[in-house]
Swiss-Prot record:
Ranges annotated as spanning the membrane: 18-38, 39-59, 69-89, 93-113, 127-147, 182-202
Record's keyword terms, sorted: Cell inner membrane, Cell membrane, Electron transport, Membrane, Translocase, Transmembrane, Transmembrane helix, Transport
Family: Belongs to the NqrDE/RnfAE family.
Protein name per UniProt: Ion-translocating oxidoreductase complex subunit E
NCBIfam families: PRK12405.1, rnfE
Subunit structure: The complex is composed of six subunits: RnfA, RnfB, RnfC, RnfD, RnfE and RnfG.
GO BP of this protein: electron transport chain
Amino acid sequence: MTNYREIAWQGLWKNNPGLVQLLGLCPLLAVTATLTNALGLGVATMLVLIGSNILVSLVRDYVPKEIRIPVFVMIIAALVTAVQLLINAYAYGLYLSLGIFLPLIVTNCIIIGRAEAFASRNNAFSAAFDGLMMGLGFTLVLAVLGATREILGQGTLFDGADQLLGPWAKALTIQVWQVDTPFLLAMLPPGAFIVMGLLIALKNVIDKKLKERQPEVAVQPSVTRARITKVS
């Protein structure tokens, strides 16, 4: 029986693809200069994850093991193309901001990894839920990283939200503080590496505190039984 609570815990925290597995670092560090870009890439990746997991789960019994990886990549590429066309049609500004990193979702190790490790061994519903949780976990890391970099670099939050949600979303832009000169370190990839390292360190500290709160289980010493044979 599938443990959906464990799947959610793995995707959102314990085995988070961004903070623990450190997968998809190239787009994660390059695109997250603003919260809007981070959410756009995160949602696109999550949609591809869910779709690819479902399709891989449905065809897993019909694809020979020898060619499963090329088939999985073709499925992922088709879904990425569909998502790319949708963003191009309905969020052209975001499409331009994401640039080459949108089609590069095809090569994201998170997606092919979940297809191989989980979707190819479980039913479609469980695979879809796993894709949703892994996608949400990745999107949350992107969002926190993007929000932190945007606040430090520009002093704003949700700048350019109209690229993702339409003209009405311009009202969502928040001016946290007035910045005369942008803080370039936070907006460039080196700053992304620093913030990412701090997020990983924070997660490790939280995990350590949670582990210390758990009651220790007493380990019973093993008893070795000696066999005595009569010596004549």
